[in-house]
Amino acid sequence: MSMSSGESERIAICCVLLDIVEAMGISADIKSCRHYQSLRDKTDIADSDFEGARSVSVLSSLVTLKGMHYNKKMLLALTVCDLFSGQTPVSLNLRIAFETLMNAIEWPISFSEILAISRTE
């Protein structure tokens, strides 16, 4: 079954977000993140995409996200920043995880840079 590029992107975004929440080991609500609404509006993410995300790998999702438009990459970065900012202080491991994710999708931005952008909006 082949997916459209839009569907592949949505599922890849959900896969990465679910993996991040799981790795954080706390119950974080993705949908209550400040920037998630904009990300959802821009990509048309539906609840079913989170279900679909359970059957794809994080690695294949990163490959998909590399080709995504930079506006969407920015919204993903801001949403991940929202998730991580729920933990105070944000641990070094989370900052490194953020930068590793951004490098993997070819959107090299540091956590401190995205945090500054997030706070000025």
What are the residue ranges of the model-derived segments?
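Small-residue-enriched hydrophobic alpha-helices in membranes
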Residues: M1-E121
